[in-house]
């Protein structure tokens, strides 16, 4: 699974963006977060995710925090 860093979070709107190792930003919805509470996520945290395509661009599914 690809890894990246949470680049932007809009907690009140229920979504954010992950920047992957190549610098591409992937949209993610709060419903894609696994094993963590969306409201407790913070920008700069490292995650792994499933890369998905959508009509609006790169999207992240199955978002999980990385330990350490």
Label every PLM stretch briefly.
Residues 34-48:
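Short nucleic-acid-contacting surface segments enriched for D/E, G, S/T with interspersed K/R
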Residues 25-37:
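Beta-strand/loop nucleic-acid-binding surfaces
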Residues 1-11:
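Structural detector for short beta-strands of small beta-barrel domains
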Residues 52-68:
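OB-fold/S1-family single-stranded nucleic acid-binding modules
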Residues 10, 22, 64-67:
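A generic structural motif
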């Amino acid at each position: 699974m690809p890894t990246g860093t949470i680049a932007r979070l809009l907690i009140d709107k229920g979504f954010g963006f992950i920047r992957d190792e190549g610098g591409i930003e992937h949209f993610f919805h709060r419903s894609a977060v696994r094993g963590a509470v969306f409201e407790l996520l913070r920008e700069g945290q490292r995650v792994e995710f499933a890369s998905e395509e959508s009509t609006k661009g790169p999207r992240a599914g199955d978002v999980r925090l990385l330990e350490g």
